[in-house]
């Protein structure tokens, strides 16, 4: 999988509802929304609403994903993609690339981080990340579980 293919999967392969934002340009003194530059690519465009900051769906999704990773994990989407690329787009624990999250839906890798320090450890599949969370990131408990399943 290439970086571009993975980015497309990250941005588009989610079953999230799309928000439609509409505003009436006639309510503004000039009768239209002023042109502005896209926050992602810099292209000038005429927005459909004053709060619109991106020229196209791709730039919007990219910008939203970047804002999410910065807000929640303190990394940019480029840093996320660098991590994914270093891991060959597979889970750092189980090595799976296309893990199932439900009926006909495969998920992207999620950011695993230390909840005490906030430091990003790597990218995991949903199942491995959930398993670590259920063990409360406790190395002793994980070791005990490892010994237990060897029996």
Which positions does each model-derived feature cover?
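Contiguous alpha-helical segments
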Residues: 2-110, 115-151
